[in-house]
Each structure stands twice: as C-alpha cells, then as structure tokens.
Amino acid sequence: MGCGHSRLSCCKPPKKRRQRPDQPPKPEPQELGPLNGDTATTDHVCASEEAEQHQKAITRILQQHEEDKKKWAQQVEKERELELGEKLNEQRKVLEGEHVEALRVLQASYEQDKEALTHSFQEAKAALQETIDRLTAQIEAFQAKMKRAEESILSRDYKKHIQEHGSLSQFWEQELESLHFVIEMKNERIHELDKRLILMETVKEKNLLLEEKITTLQQENEDLHARGRNQMVVSRQLSEDLLLAREALEKESQSRRQLQQEKEELLYRVLGADAAPAFPLASVTPTEVSFLAT
C-alpha cells in the first residue's frame, strides 16, 4: 500500500556490477557511509507513511463501524415494530375469528327465532281468521234462523190463538215468554262471542309484539352485517400494511447483507495486505475488536 512500491525502488541498495576475471578489482568508493544513512532515512519515511495510511484506513473502518451500529440499531427497532405489528395482526385474526363465530351463532339464533316467530304468527293468524269466519257465519246463520223462526212462530201462533181463544192476551204472554227465552239465548251467545273477541284481541297483541321483535331482530342483523363489512375493510387494510412492512424489511435485509459483504471485503483488503504492521494500532474497544474479527 501507499509507499510500498516506492520503498522497493528507493530503499534497496544499488546492485554491484560483476567484474571480469582479467580486470583488477576497483577500490570501494569513499561515499558508502553517507549512502547507507540516506537509505535508513528513506526506510523510516516510507514506514511512517505506510503507518499513517494504515491508521487512516482503520479510523475509516471504525467510523464505518459506528455508522453500521447506528443503522443496525435502527434496523432492530424496525424489526421490533414489525414483530409488534405481527403480534397485533395475530390478535386481530383471533378477534376476527371470535367475531365471525359470534356473528354466526347470533345469525343462526336470529334465523331460528325468526322462523319460529313467523311460524307461530302465521298459525295464530290463520287460527284467528278461521275463528272469525266461523263465528261470522254462525252469527249470520243464527240471525237468519231466528228471524225465520220468529216470523213463522209469530204468524202461526197468532192465527191459531185467534181461532181457539178469540183473545190476544194469552197469546202475547206466550210470545213474551218466547221472546224472553230467545233474548236469554242471544245474551249467552253474545257473552261467548265477547270471550272469543277478547281472546282474539290478546292474540292480536301477541302478534304485534312478535312483529316488533322481528323488526328489532332484522335491525340487529343489519347492524351486525354492517359491522362485519367494516371489520373486513379494516382487516384488508391491516393486511396491506403488513405486506408493505414485510417488503420494506426484505429490502432492508438485502441492504444490510450488501453492507456486510462490502465491510468484509474492505477488511480483507486492509488487514490482508500486511498481517503484521510495524506501527502501534489505535486503541479500540472490545466491541470494535470483535467487529473487526468478524
């Protein structure tokens, strides 16, 4: 590195020329002493320059190491955030499962209640309508029959009484008794009809309550569907955010691997060129030493 090439060229003594056998030996030059002094000075300068370059390289590596530590601390924080995001995502999935299960149970219960109430309502409505029709027909038939009976009895008895007695007093007494009996029968019939009407009103009130309950259940079902749709939207958004976070983590991991590879190459170039430098290394912490060793 640095002055390595110049050290080879300027720090070695000049080679001696080979003398021929027939030539007499030449005397050694008198300037050998100063030449050896210059060579030692040059070696010292080259060693100092090389030590300075090694020191700068190690300082640069340590600075890069500090930057890497900061980046890795940020990366650890990001990974913690991603881990927290994954835990939140798992909790969200569990809550979604519980929500879906509760919604399914509630929906099934709602459908069962709705079906039972609808069936009960239809049966009560049909029975009530049948009772109304039957009572109406009975009343109409009874009224027609009573009218015909009254007309027939009154006309026949009136004519017979006139033929037998020639007086109307006894006839009217009998007619009053007959009318009293008819009125009693009608009163009993009216009481029976009143009871049935009260029963019909009770059934009608129950049907109204059932209709209100069905309406309430339908509204709750619509609310549950709306909440389910909102939950699905939030779930999709969280899934998209998680996917983006994973992509960012993958890019950061690739960048870190590339940085690690560049660091190893730089350390190999710096430390592999001269395994035993002839200068004191700067003081480094145990963490930096372990980093350089890796």
Curated annotation (Swiss-Prot):
Residues 1-43 are annotated as: Disordered. The keyword Phosphoprotein applies. GO terms for biological process: spindle midzone assembly. The modification Phosphoserine is found at S152, S239. It is found in: Cytoplasm, Cytoskeleton, Spindle; Midbody. Disulfide bonds: none annotated. Transmembrane segments: none annotated. GO terms for cellular component: cytoplasm; midbody; nucleus; spindle midzone. GO terms for molecular function: microtubule binding. A lipid is attached at G2 (N-myristoyl glycine). The keyword Cytoplasm applies. Residues 20-29 have a biased composition (Basic and acidic residues). Keywords: Coiled coil, Cytoplasm, Cytoskeleton, Lipoprotein, Myristate, Phosphoprotein. Belongs to the CCDC69 family. PANTHER family: COILED-COIL DOMAIN-CONTAINING PROTEIN 69 (PTHR24200:SF6), TOUCAN, ISOFORM A (PTHR24200). This is Coiled-coil domain-containing protein 69. The lineage of its organism: Eukaryota, Metazoa, Chordata, Craniata, Vertebrata. The gene is CCDC69.
